[in-house]
Amino acid sequence: MPSARGKSKSKAPITFGDLAIYFSQEEWEWLSPIQKDLYEDVMLENYRNLVSLGLSFRRPNVITLLEKGKAPWMVEPVRRRRAPDSGSKCETKKLPPNQCNKSGQSICQKLVSAQQKAPTRKSGCNKNSVLVKPKKGHSGKKPLKCNDCGKTFSRSFSLKLHQNIHTGEKPFECSNCRKAFRQISSILLHQRIHSGKKSHECNKCGESFNQRTTLILHMRIHDGKEILDCGKALSQCQSFNIHQKIHVVGNVCQCRKCGKAFNQMSSLLLHKKIHNGKKTHKYNKCGRGFKKKSVFVVHKRIHAGEKIPENAKALSQSLQQRSHHLENPFKCRKCGKLFNRISPLMLHQRIHTSEKPYKCDKCDKFFRRLSTLILHLRIHNGEKLYRCNKCEKVCNRHSSLIQHQKVHTKKKKLFECKECGKMFSGTANLKIHQNIHSEEKPFKCNKCSKVFGRQSFLIEHQRIHTGEKPYQCEECGKAFSHRISLTRHKRIHTEDRPYECDQCGKAFSQSAHLAQHERIHTGEKPYTCKTCGKAFSQRTSLILHERSHTGEKPYECNECGKAFSSGSDLIRHQRSHSSEKPYECSKCGKAYSRSSSLIRHQNTHSEEKA
């Protein structure tokens, strides 16, 4: 039956040739090492899949070449052997040298006979040999020219691939994260991040990798091979350095300007860009720097009071978001913080997950960062590397030394921002800070209509309304909406209070708190109420007082709806719902929800003694 025959033809089995992709020498040289690795992975995987299906066909030459580590466009020299079986319609023969006098390679030529043109599937060519045709490149003719840079190509494929560099076209988009790529090989490699596929496994320790090159570098750890110095071959010894520093405390890459330590030279080089001022376009009025001249120009227009046209609103918004969306595309889903690279984001996320993968073998303490573990191990080794030139105190961290030295420099005058009360050690820092209050504020809170100059400030502010507190203290479990609040809180546990009052000796963890405390001795009250003229030593006290005139009560209880003028009053009130009594008498164990109630109770014990 004719219809049956036609049906059988349409169900012909798939062959390796249907899935294979072949490159000429010129096209192969265009590929990067990562793309070549990807090509090898895909071809070998396709071959294994077909074999696993039980399909019978000859081993393709391209697979043999790839397994031997040779370039897939090369063809092995033809051995003297018997002609292939009658089922194959392919022959491999060496062309006479005069047919290609500039190429010294053997060329596999497929000879198609009249019988091969028959419509039946069986008479097709089953031999998957890699064809390398005599190239136009030998004659020196490259008819295809790039109009942008004048570079010539012998194939339209190569020209199109090259032109994407000039046009910036990235036609291949990842469906998971919308990241775009110029070449399909790049997107295939990228998608392994989402799929978690790691096809290259170490046969010694079982660790898997996305790329073959990474596996080869990893194998050097087991082989114990000498790795070149970081400065000479950083890209080749990076994996070894990471692994080595888990076991060896030494050779820490340290920034000479700020003392920050890194476990990789590449991380240090990236960090140094902060100090070397890579933002070449700096505006003198506010001190801000910009990488792009176009953004710098728009920023100057805002200072000049020039109105940005309606059609340039998007550009103005991108200016405000430059440090977040343009330069920091990676966002934390928990707290909204933005990062310029995925690796700092992954490190940051450990704050929320409490993941601490690095363990100290001596005291079983765990750490989020390898660099922190390395610094911690110095405590066990008795190392104290940083000495104060004022009092000879030694610290094992440069950051601790800087913090300590503030004790000696505390007498320097602090400059306060009249808008928010924040303190600064110099007028230059205060001036830069004051731009926050004067600049355009396009980000508005939909709850209270407060406006902000940066999206990150808005995200932090909105936590007041949502009650979200993503930063938790590991010591006592107390949670905070801002990371800086957690950092300050941790000083309670470490008892690190470098700021001491000259009058009474009381110490503080923050310079701003010391400045506020010193007003008790001086009697200074710089904050005056415009309504009644009452003066206060702290701005927060003035804000709370002003609410008595306005009747504003922004803090509302979720349980009963009662509102309060201060957050502390709300916290005290909420204890009536939770029955929480954190203030306990050390003598009789009786507990209270308010500290004032505890003080009154403790007076009864003192009266009994009397």
Swiss-Prot record:
CDD domains, alphabetically?
A: KRAB_A-box (cd07765)
Which portions of the chain have biased composition (kind: Polar residues)?
119-129
Protein localization: Nucleus
Q: Does the keyword Translocase apply?
A: no
**Residue ranges of domain KRAB in the record:** 14-85
Please verify whether the record's keywords include Zinc: yes
Chain positions of all zinc fingers (C2H2-type): 144-166, 172-194, 200-222, 253-275, 281-303, 330-352, 358-380, 386-408, 415-437, 443-465, 471-493, 499-521, 527-549, 555-577, 583-605
Region listing for Disordered, in residue ranges: 119-139
Task: Name a biological process GO annotation.
Answer: regulation of transcription by RNA polymerase II
| UniProt GO cellular component terms | nucleus
Sorted alphabetically, which PROSITE patterns does this protein's record hold? KRAB (PS50805), ZINC_FINGER_C2H2_1 (PS00028), ZINC_FINGER_C2H2_2 (PS50157)
Which GO molecular function, any one, fits this protein according to its record? Answer: zinc ion binding
Q: Which InterPro entries match?
A: KRAB, KRAB_dom_sf, Znf_C2H2_sf, Znf_C2H2_type
Q: What is its main location?
A: nucleus
Task: Write out the function statement from the record.
Answer: May be involved in transcriptional regulation.
- Protein family: Belongs to the krueppel C2H2-type zinc-finger protein family.
Q: What is this protein called?
A: Zinc finger protein 667
* Species for this entry: Homo sapiens (Human)
